[in-house]
């Protein structure tokens, strides 16, 4: 089924979502399953880059949400550490054997949890981490220990999502756009990127940077303030904005301490960039 009819079917299901349940069978269930399988395989994605920026496919988010209406929770015997779990969403690796993992081409360390409909590209390394429904992790990226990739988040190629970092999702609270981490980015330990923020290509976030849609991102060199996106090749650290009136509290912000171009980045390690 081409994408246009698939989209039309999902939009129609969304309008009558209250009628769906775990007892729903036939074409209604099949169309949602087709979308989830395509997301899982990476042939569809919730957000796509084009020449004029990113396009979010809302209908794919709707399909993910509809899947929760169509399934009851069940005991899952292959949870973290082999412990049983009880959930509506099966794990991506259910039933996988040596051949299936080798075919997929990525590594998943014990303790890595990926829910079905998330796409993991070849040459990804998953440390004990969590990747939620509808997310996409592209090739050459490492998701480090205790990092989380939220629902429908998009992680680019050759990124490093450091230990304990959080990449926000879109399903709860419902957000218009997923978090997007473009290619060649480094997200420092215990940082959080949420509420549809876009971290553009080649950027470096130091440890403990918190970014939401309303976070002010201040360019130290120019004074320019960005919100909702980190410009390409920025090096960002936590900071504070002074109060407008004496005696009032300062407000947290993020600070672009410098920019690097691709030539500089190719010759300079990430650690050196953060220690300037």
UniProtKB/Swiss-Prot annotation:
CDD domains in UniProt: LbH_THP_succinylT (cd03350)
Keywords: Acyltransferase, Amino-acid biosynthesis, Cytoplasm, Diaminopimelate biosynthesis, Lysine biosynthesis, Repeat, Transferase
Signal peptide (UniProt feature, chain positions): none
Superkingdom of source: Bacteria
Gene3D superfamilies with a match to the protein in the record: Hexapeptide repeat proteins (2.160.10.10), Tetrahydrodipicolinate-N-succinyltransferase, N-terminal domain (1.10.166.10)
Annotated GO CC locations: cytoplasm
GO annotation, biological process: diaminopimelate biosynthetic process; lysine biosynthetic process via diaminopimelate
SUPFAM superfamilies attached to this UniProt entry: Trimeric LpxA-like enzymes
Protein EC: 2.3.1.117
Catalytic activity: (S)-2,3,4,5-tetrahydrodipicolinate + succinyl-CoA + H2O = (S)-2-succinylamino-6-oxoheptanedioate + CoA
Residue positions binding substrate: 107, 144
Pathway stated in the Swiss-Prot or TrEMBL entry: Amino-acid biosynthesis; L-lysine biosynthesis via DAP pathway; LL-2,6-diaminopimelate from (S)-tetrahydrodipicolinate (succinylase route): step 1/3
Subcellular location: Cytoplasm
Top enzyme class: transferase
PANTHER family: 2,3,4,5-TETRAHYDROPYRIDINE-2,6-DICARBOXYLATE N-SUCCINYLTRANSFERASE, MOLYBDENUM COFACTOR GUANYLYLTRANSFERASE
Family per record: Belongs to the transferase hexapeptide repeat family.
The protein's assembly and partners: Homotrimer.
Protein name: 2,3,4,5-tetrahydropyridine-2,6-dicarboxylate N-succinyltransferase
Species per Swiss-Prot/TrEMBL record: Gluconobacter oxydans (strain 621H) (Gluconobacter suboxydans)
Gene from which the chain derives: dapD
